[in-house]
Curated annotation (Swiss-Prot):
<dbReference type="Pfam" id="PF00303">
    <property type="entry name" value="Thymidylat_synt"/>
</dbReference>
<keyword id="KW-0489">Methyltransferase</keyword>
<feature type="binding site" description="in other chain">
    <location>
        <position position="50"/>
    </location>
    <ligand>
        <name>dUMP</name>
    </ligand>
</feature>
<dbReference type="GO" id="GO:0005542">
    <property type="term" value="F:folic acid binding"/>
</dbReference>
<feature type="active site" description="Nucleophile">
    <location>
        <position position="195"/>
    </location>
</feature>
<dbReference type="GO" id="GO:0005737">
    <property type="term" value="C:cytoplasm"/>
</dbReference>
<comment type="similarity">
    <text>Belongs to the thymidylate synthase family.</text>
</comment>
<feature type="region of interest" description="Disordered">
    <location>
        <begin position="1"/>
        <end position="28"/>
    </location>
</feature>
<keyword id="KW-0545">Nucleotide biosynthesis</keyword>
<dbReference type="GO" id="GO:0005759">
    <property type="term" value="C:mitochondrial matrix"/>
</dbReference>
<feature type="cross-link" description="Glycyl lysine isopeptide (Lys-Gly) (interchain with G-Cter in SUMO2)">
    <location>
        <position position="292"/>
    </location>
</feature>
<dbReference type="InterPro" id="IPR036926">
    <property type="entry name" value="Thymidate_synth/dCMP_Mease_sf"/>
</dbReference>
<dbReference type="GO" id="GO:0006235">
    <property type="term" value="P:dTTP biosynthetic process"/>
</dbReference>
<feature type="binding site">
    <location>
        <begin position="175"/>
        <end position="176"/>
    </location>
    <ligand>
        <name>dUMP</name>
    </ligand>
</feature>
<dbReference type="GO" id="GO:1990825">
    <property type="term" value="F:sequence-specific mRNA binding"/>
</dbReference>
<dbReference type="GO" id="GO:0000900">
    <property type="term" value="F:mRNA regulatory element binding translation repressor activity"/>
</dbReference>
<dbReference type="GO" id="GO:0005743">
    <property type="term" value="C:mitochondrial inner membrane"/>
</dbReference>
Amino acid sequence: MPVAGSELPRRPLPPAAQERDAEPRPPHGELQYLGQIQHILRCGVRKDDRTGTGTLSVFGMQARYSLRDEFPLLTTKRVFWKGVLEELLWFIKGSTNAKELSSKGVKIWDANGSRDFLDSLGFSTREEGDLGPVYGFQWRHFGAEYRDMESDYSGQGVDQLQRVIDTIKTNPDDRRIIMCAWNPRDLPLMALPPCHALCQFYVVNSELSCQLYQRSGDMGLGVPFNIASYALLTYMIAHITGLKPGDFIHTLGDAHIYLNHIEPLKIQLQREPRPFPKLRILRKVEKIDDFKAEDFQIEGYNPHPTIKMEMAV
């Protein structure tokens, strides 16, 4: 029997045993979204809504998605990446013209900017496509007086987005790094009040994280889009400020499933998540306004097929 300290060297563990001894891998981030869908289907309360479609609704949900070397573009159905990217660039530009986005092949705001829809809200003198002071206007010109989608608002109102970036650079421990699209004075002028209303940024260990408060979440169509959009915004701001992306925390108020989305979502729940893709920014960009669609590349996105769901207007 060997004396203490003279034990023979241990044989290396076989690969399977090494895996067992290693740190357990965290569960796939998409399982949080699928779990939210299951919870709403099981526990949601039947509620009427503005669109007349009807929903199952739960109040108050949260999920946390890692942005470290992965990008939360859901895989249990194909998410319209071009739409996510072009809409965010359109917000950053401060545009409120739905036709501008539509001209790039992204039609997601067409219904809310249509002649019939604007007329139904009493905006009969407003040009078709003019959504009013929605997200982009509030991000870049909060407090300015809105006239129309063609006016030049340079230097007017508070540029919340640039203020966020400047504060991250100069005072990253600040607890007030907030951007808010909910402007009570302007709500009556909007074709659609903001669903994703407020986001806050947080810096620690050279990582940038973002938490979004979304007052209203269409779980089938909108929420997968919103997750990717604010994850992308976090990547962009991290790039400009010399930080690494950390987490995206998604807090939902009224989390709902439209009744006509129940069957499509049951199909989605039967699918196994695949690895999230990676997002590459292909050149060094110094200013948020200088980003272009061709600066971004999604790698390794291998989703399940598209699932058709109708938008409630």
